[in-house]
């Protein structure tokens, strides 16, 4: 799961500077940088604040963060076929 990278991609797509997202989320810019670079894993309450500040539902952030390694073997084929299409549709939402 690439949660930090997903947060960074959404932030950049929405053209929100890192310092603004950090401020709106109630965390420091340094901590947000660590999250975005997958050096730290935020707790659920921090994720909720980041999600709110990004105006993006938390389940959507989790979904976009999934990689094939996160999916059970029995479901990898369908995930690999559906995931790119769903991500493309979702990117239009963001």
Where are the regions that the model predicts?
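Short, charged recognition helix plus adjacent turn
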Residues: 62-94
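Conserved hydrophobic/aromatic packing and binding residues within compact polymer-binding modules
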Residues: 7, 21-22, 32-35, 61
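Helix-turn-helix/winged-helix DNA-binding modules
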Residues: 13, 39-42, 53
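Recognition helix of helix-turn-helix/homeodomain-like DNA-binding domains
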Residues: 26-41
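Short basic helix-loop element that most often maps to the first helix and adjoining turn
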Residues: 5-24, 76, 83-84
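Hydrophobic micro-packing sites on short alpha-helices
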Residues: 46-54, 60-62
């Amino acid at each position: 799961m690439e949660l930090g990278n997903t947060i960074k991609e959404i932030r950049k797509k929405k053209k929100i500077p890192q310092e603004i997202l950090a401020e709106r989320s109630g965390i420091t810019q340094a901590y947000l940088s660590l999250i975005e670079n997958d050096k730290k894993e935020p707790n659920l309450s921090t994720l909720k604040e980041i999600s709110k500040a990004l105006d993006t539902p938390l389940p959507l952030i989790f979904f976009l963060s999934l990689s094939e390694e996160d999916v059970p073997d029995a479901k990898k084929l369908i995930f690999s076929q559906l995931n790119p299409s769903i991500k493309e549709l979702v990117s239009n939402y963001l």
